[in-house]
Amino acid sequence: MPDTVNYTLTIEKPFTHYCEVEILLKDITQDHIIFSMPVWTPGSYLIREFAKNVEDVKAENSEGKALNFEKINKNSWKVDTKNEKSVKIKYKAYCNELTVRTSLINTEHAFINSSGTFMYVKGFEKKKCILAINCPAGWNKISTGLEKGSVNIYSAENYDVFIDSPVEIGNQNVLEFDIKGIKHSICMAGKGNYKDETIINDFKKIAEEEIKLFGGEIPYKHYTYIIHLVEKGGGGLEHLNSFVAQASRWIFNDDALYKKFLGLVSHEFFHLWNVKRIRPAALGPFDYETENYTKSLWVAEGWTSFYDDVILRRCDILNNKEYLEFLNVNVNDIMRFKGRFSQSLAESSFDTWIKFYRKDENYSNSQVSYYTKGALVTLLLNIEIIKSTEASASLDDALRMLYEDHKKDQSKGYSEERMKEVCEIVCGKKLDWFWEKYVYGVEELPVKDYLNDCGVLLTDENETSSGILDVEIKNDNGKLIITKVIAGGTAYESGLNANDELIALDGTRVDPVLAGALLKNYKEGDEIKVLINREGFIKELSIIFLKPLPKYKIIESENKTETQQKFFNKWING
């Protein structure tokens, strides 16, 4: 039985977008060995069929003699190893999609999403993995969370850790800072208008604040940030001691966009604890062959989405006004749409494999995001704990308790029952009613009441507005194309559809500038004719303006009571 699984990654012609992978096993005794490519990547809950990028599979023994093998399903190859002492499988992988969950190789650099590149060996998943990297001449830097050995040699204690460690190869700008003697490396891949010192200072502030929240202990030997600076893009993906994120390369001089990016940094770094260590039982050890279902993604992502902006406030990257403006976006993303009455948080978590990554124009009318609604419910839960304990405790304490659970037994995650129990212990009372209404149920969230408990006001900016269709529209070369029709609004009830082109309102030709001005002439109860282009046919519809759907605004009260101020301080400061 081999002690290690040895991988070699070779990038010979980066302009082809291919890499070559070899997997070597020595001292084998099995009559056959199965090699499989994962079908999904942890943290991104969609079957992605990474085996589609695999080509030219070969198998041989230690002398280079070809071994018989067959493909036994969509992502697995079975090699005949009877009477053989070693086996090597070789294949090419096509890498030409730069996202946080896929791989790219080009003449500038390579980003390797390990779960979509490296097969695992059935029965050998717990063995140490060693990776040798052969990169093109002139590429001098490798950034990864893997443990570094000799030149271009890296290792992981098992396959789970191995593929939870993406790899960036090229000549990226690497910035560094230390916290308590632990090195943090920031890989900035691509051109951008950032300043090294600003990036280092802000990333360090965020890391220190989150480490403090969890008691000051650092759960890793080193940490790697991989930031891809792109023309257009965004998003991030957490890993065990690293994360990868995308940012538009020219955002760094725009204060609002830069702070939004720092929210992403805060989010992905927070996952170090919430999901990578404090995790639902279904999320590790992983089954890479199929969906891994859980009803607790609203905790894994929703709690993290609540804290990502709170952390920015705690380390003074945001002030109170800016923080509440960020929160306001989440409130409107949920409270304006009927999807909050159609799908519970538990259902949203469970169905992520078939819904969340396959959004259509009706998504907001029929579903909720376990990120966004999860963050709102987390806010309410936090305030419930604060109120019930007279601000002597908060959700921070529940997180720390769950983290202590993890440290006692790192082999398994929490059950839904244990997670709720911890919240009840911290809150000092049963919370079955809260879960039934807001996690497993679809009752209206009492956001206004909970915010008011903390001296924060929620108002409706559309209360006195008029002439609102309640649609989302894009300007397509001067054409006004409806992209989303909000259920319950004027357009929805009048029969307008997504993909309709607005041509005229009440006999007047509209354009992107004129449309808004014309709509202001109409009030609730007015009826007008709307001319549209629907799939190449011109149609005229009658619409009656309804009361506009709410558009919320959150502001901090200037006249908080002593109790409201105490609760607000606990929410913001922990």
Can you annotate each of these PLM segments?
Residues 308, 318-574:
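C-terminal recognition in membrane/secretory proteostasis and scaffolding
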Residues 1-40:
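Early extracytoplasmic/domain-onset interaction patches
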Residues 141-143, 218-221, 281-282, 313-325, ...:
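Acidic/polar loop patches that form or flank catalytic/metal-binding clefts of enzymes
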Residues 5-7, 19-23, 87-89, 129-131, ...:
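Hydrophobic residues positioned within well-ordered beta-strands of beta-sheet architectures
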Residues 243-252, 277-278, 289-340, 531, ...:
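Post-HExxH zinc-binding segment in Zn-dependent metallohydrolases
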Residues 47-56, 60-220, 232-233:
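Non-catalytic architectural context of zinc metalloproteases
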